[in-house]
Amino acid sequence: MRSISCSKEYAEDVRNLNIRPEQLDDFFGQKDLIQNLKVFINAAKTRTEALDHVLLHGPPGLGKTTLAQIISKELRVSFRATSGPLLNKAGDLAAVLTTLNAKDVLFIDEIHRLNRSIEEVLYTAMEDFCLDLLVGEGPSTRTLRIDLPPFTLVGATTRLGLLSAPLRDRFGIPLRLEFYSFEELVDIIKRGTKVFSAEIEEDAIQEIACRARGTPRIALRLLRRIRDFVEVKDNKKITHKIADSALSKLGIDKMGLNKLDVDYLRFLFNTSGSVGIDTISIALSEDSGNIEETVEPYLVKISFVKRTPRGRVLTDQGKEYLSLQY
């Protein structure tokens, strides 16, 4: 079995552990979600039970991994992490689950990428805290039942629609993370500047927040790259002028859109009517999954694009943006 590891996004986040909040009270944004999660965690602790299984879903970079880690810290239990693509067979899942202690948190990132055979094994683990594994071959095949301690599965996905209904329904606490407000991103960037020991003007912070697509991961990534420009030029402070110049060099416009976003919008503009995702994928030479996960959510949020049963449609706001930019 491949060892428990991290997805690409999880590995990127690990490099910034000192930026992450470690308790719910320090978590910026997602106010209603956080308040509800506090209730669920405190109730589980009061009953001395394992927290019910949690499903975190929403666009990339909004804090799903961070929340999973905070849940384990709030519960004061161990945290184990893996991802859907790493669990190729039932034995892989069994090897992970049998290492858990009572009430531990198991985090499965990209849970929508679990294959169906693994999902079926997971059903009994989630509901009955046991594993039913087939042992042997042919006529000698038998079922081996392994009892498990009560545990909490925290699944994370950017593609909720790809989860099978039976798996989705086994999560007692489904939580959707939303894009962050401008004010919340400003607070997150300020925290980042303290960790990076970076001196920065308020106008520069606001400029980064405006271009961060409502996403903390992007905000902190842009902050790091701007800091690179500052250090190479031996400047002492991140000014608004420096931030604006660096972001332009990075290909990030005033709305936070990059070349792929603009190419997507222009293709819709040049195509009459609605357009299917596969057609867009071929035209842009870009994976359709990446378009659905990283491009479309923000364009839909800012009302540049509508997703309809017949395909994607450029809105009047999207057309106006293109007319002003090009």
Swiss-Prot record:
Residues 254-326 are annotated as: Head domain (RuvB-H). Its EC number is 3.6.4.-. It is found in: Cytoplasm. It is an enzyme of class 3 (hydrolase). ATP binds at I19, R20, G61, K64, T65, T66, E127, D128, F129, R170, Y180, R217. Its main location: cytoplasm. GO terms for cellular component: cytoplasm; Holliday junction resolvase complex. GO terms for biological process: DNA recombination; DNA repair. Signal peptide: none annotated. It comes from the Bacteria. Residues 1-180 are annotated as: Large ATPase domain (RuvB-L). Disulfide bonds: none annotated. One of its GO terms (molecular function) is four-way junction helicase activity. Residues 181-251 are annotated as: Small ATPAse domain (RuvB-S). Keywords: ATP-binding, Cytoplasm, DNA damage, DNA recombination, DNA repair, DNA-binding, Hydrolase, Nucleotide-binding. Mg(2+) binds at T65. DNA binds at R307, R312. It catalyses: ATP + H2O = ADP + phosphate + H(+). The RuvA-RuvB-RuvC complex processes Holliday junction (HJ) DNA during genetic recombination and DNA repair, while the RuvA-RuvB complex plays an important role in the rescue of blocked DNA replication forks via replication fork reversal (RFR). RuvA specifically binds to HJ cruciform DNA, conferring on it an open structure. The RuvB hexamer acts as an ATP-dependent pump, pulling dsDNA into and through the RuvAB complex. RuvB forms 2 homohexamers on either side of HJ DNA bound by 1 or 2 RuvA tetramers; 4 subunits per hexamer contact DNA at a time. HAMAP family: DNA_HJ_migration_RuvB. Has 3 domains, the large (RuvB-L) and small ATPase (RuvB-S) domains and the C-terminal head (RuvB-H) domain. The head domain binds DNA, while the ATPase domains jointly bind ATP, ADP or are empty depending on the state of the subunit in the translocation cycle. During a single DNA translocation step the structure of each domain remains the same, but their relative positions change. Homohexamer. Forms an RuvA(8)-RuvB(12)-Holliday junction (HJ) complex. HJ DNA is sandwiched between 2 RuvA tetramers; dsDNA enters through RuvA and exits via RuvB. An RuvB hexamer assembles on each DNA strand where it exits the tetramer. Each RuvB hexamer is contacted by two RuvA subunits (via domain III) on 2 adjacent RuvB subunits; this complex drives branch migration. In the full resolvosome a probable DNA-RuvA(4)-RuvB(12)-RuvC(2) complex forms which resolves the HJ. NCBIfam families: PRK00080.1 (NF000868), ruvB (TIGR00635). Belongs to the RuvB family. This is Holliday junction branch migration complex subunit RuvB. It comes from Wolbachia sp. subsp. Brugia malayi (strain TRS).
